[in-house]
Amino acid sequence: MASEHTAKAFDSDLQELTRLVAEMGGLAERMIVESVDALIRRDVALGQRVVAADAEIDNLQRVIEERAVLTIARRQPMAVDLREIVGAMRVATDLERIGDLAKNMGKRVAALESDFQPLKLIRGLEHMTDLVQSQVKSVLDAYAAHDLPAAMTVWKGDEEVDAICTSLFRELLTYMMEDPRNISFCIHLMFCAKNIERIGDHATNIAETVFYMIEGQQMLDKRPKGDMTTFATTAPGN
């Protein structure tokens, strides 16, 4: 009976970790969409709400790490059970970083001054955001369902995000060269595009965590990359 009780308690601990990761993931998905929406609509209030939401993401990461460490100390899990707990901590770390990147985009809304807003660039950013948000949702679903093929689909899709980012950078550079008055807006958009691309990288990280949880080893394959840009993703102090 004691061992049965211990097993049920451990299952309950794992279920709670999964629930917390799902809650954190839902918040991260919302922050991605709202940060770009705020930027496109110049909605400072929405941008500020995204910034404020980052504190909730940070708190959820702390709770997940504390519960994970406590579960390891109490249950002393091995093999697949231990990988479940380590996986939850790794996913939480990536989601916290996604929150930071979305927060940085939310902060930039207030800095936009120009009315310059070419439709082609905006549509490109929206397309890239939709793709990355879909990848984040898909990989979190794969994590919850232990669906390795679905996780690997996200992993392979990272190259498409990189290619869109590179194309958008080229368009932005063209607009800046054509008219110096466009430079400020285009630079902010560059930061945001690079942040979205980095969010895609974190979705790829989560896919690799799913592989680790299921297969019991790290992925050795080289990531498919199509990004030809080099750009800082956050401003100093963020």
PLM feature spans:
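Cytosolic, long alpha-helical scaffolding segments
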Residues: 1-238
